[in-house]
Amino acid sequence: MDITLTIFAQALAFAGLIWIVATKIWPPLLKAIEERQQKIAEGLAAADRSQKDLAQAQEKVNEALKDARTKANEIIDQAHARANQIIEAAKLEAIAEANRQKDLAQAEIDASATRAREELRRQVSSLAVSGAEKLLKREIDATAHKALLDELAAEI
């Protein structure tokens, strides 16, 4: 065989191989590569969207936590205010009860003092009558009068 014919046959076989590769193998290969590139691009875009969504969700969570803390502080403040109201009401009730007890004690003291005065009046009147009887029974001279007054003073 001639070298020219061999080169020509190899060139023709190579051209046929290129044509087969270009028409049958290359298009599906390019299509697969493009699909893979598109999937990778979609994956990267999805990752970017996910990061943005995550950032937005984090902002929402932070806002919700801030709102929850604010509401919790409001509830705590309301509880403190209610506790202070209860304490003030208890103080006022205790003061009122103390005043009522004081008034009852004062009334009892006044009643006891009145009873004691009445008892003293009865005793004084009894002593006065007794002293008058003794004076009328005796002859009155200065020494007897003084002794009688001393005796009455001792009884009082």
From Swiss-Prot:
Listed under subunit, the entry gives: F-type ATPases have 2 components, F(1) - the catalytic core - and F(0) - the membrane proton channel. F(1) has five subunits: alpha(3), beta(3), gamma(1), delta(1), epsilon(1). F(0) has three main subunits: a(1), b(2) and c(10-14). The alpha and beta chains form an alternating ring which encloses part of the gamma chain. F(1) is attached to F(0) by a central stalk formed by the gamma and epsilon chains, while a peripheral stalk is formed by the delta and b chains.
Q: Which is one GO molecular function term here?
A: proton-transporting ATP synthase activity, rotational mechanism
Full protein name? ATP synthase subunit b
Task: Identify the main location.
Answer: membrane
Compartments, as annotated in UniProt:
Cell inner membrane
User: Which GO cellular component term is one of those annotated?
Assistant: proton-transporting ATP synthase complex
Q: Does the keyword Transmembrane apply?
A: yes
Task: Please provide the record's keywords in A-Z order.
Answer: ATP synthesis, Cell inner membrane, Cell membrane, CF(0), Hydrogen ion transport, Ion transport, Membrane, Transmembrane, Transmembrane helix, Transport
Topology of this chain in the membrane: Single-pass membrane protein
Which HAMAP family does the UniProt record give? ATP_synth_b_bprime
Q: What top-level branch of life does the organism fall under?
A: Bacteria
Where does the sequence pass through the membrane?
A: 3-23
Report the protein's function: F(1)F(0) ATP synthase produces ATP from ADP in the presence of a proton or sodium gradient. F-type ATPases consist of two structural domains, F(1) containing the extramembraneous catalytic core and F(0) containing the membrane proton channel, linked together by a central stalk and a peripheral stalk. During catalysis, ATP synthesis in the catalytic domain of F(1) is coupled via a rotary mechanism of the central stalk subunits to proton translocation.
